[in-house]
Amino acid sequence: MFKFTEHNGVVAPLNISNIDTDAIIPKQFLQKVNKIGFGKYLFHDWRFIDKNQLKINPNFILNNYVYKNASILLTRENFGCGSSREHAVWSLLDYGFKVIISSSFSDIFFNNSFNNKLLLVVLEKKHIDYLFNLVDTKIGISFNVSLINKKITAGDLDIPFQIDDFQRLCLLNNWDNIDLTMKINHKIKSYEDNISSFLLERQEFTS
């Protein structure tokens, strides 16, 4: 993965509320446990008319050639609701999305996204409405998402967003749970040594 400082990419508008994880990736494609190869199943039942992926749905937004290389997904509230499948995040990343913008996300989906370095940006509904109007009038427009400055630049407008300081720091430095554990390994070692010493003293005292 990469250190996320800022990203400039084409925005695909998916103007649907309450998109659940089964819509993001149907359950029949969850057999694998590695993170690669799920992009082709993203929004499967919306992208394809037949189950064998031989006939695409021409009315689905991601099948529009303008959004072929879209890396930012703009959507409506409660994105990622439903079951806790991490494969939903894997499919979005494998497809090429690096940022999802919405007014709200499911808690479990939000945490899964953070753990996999997919940036979720939460904006007020008025800003989401503005962005949908913008992408409708300027089809194929790109947004700049700056994690350093915590803002989205869309057209002539800069929209600030909030993000947890710890999550921001991890994304900026590409830290995962292993990296964080290694950074405090000396504290863990010191704690373990103290516990061992305490237990030894207690054992000697009671014997």
Swiss-Prot record:
Keyword Transcription among record annotations: no
Keyword GTP-binding: no
E.C. number(s) listed in UniProt: 4.2.1.33
Pathway: Amino-acid biosynthesis; L-leucine biosynthesis; L-leucine from 3-methyl-2-oxobutanoate: step 2/4
GO BP terms: L-leucine biosynthetic process
Top-level taxon in the UniProt lineage: Bacteria
InterPro entries to which the protein is assigned, alphabetical: 3-IsopropMal_deHydase_ssu, Aconitase/3IPM_dehydase_swvl, AconitaseA/IPMdHydase_ssu_swvl, IPMI_Swivel, LeuD
Keyword vocabulary terms for this entry: Amino-acid biosynthesis, Branched-chain amino acid biosynthesis, Leucine biosynthesis, Lyase, Plasmid
Subunit structure: Heterodimer of LeuC and LeuD.
Role summary: Catalyzes the isomerization between 2-isopropylmalate and 3-isopropylmalate, via the formation of 2-isopropylmaleate.
Protein name: 3-isopropylmalate dehydratase small subunit
Protein's organism: Buchnera aphidicola subsp. Rhopalosiphum padi
Annotated gene: leuD
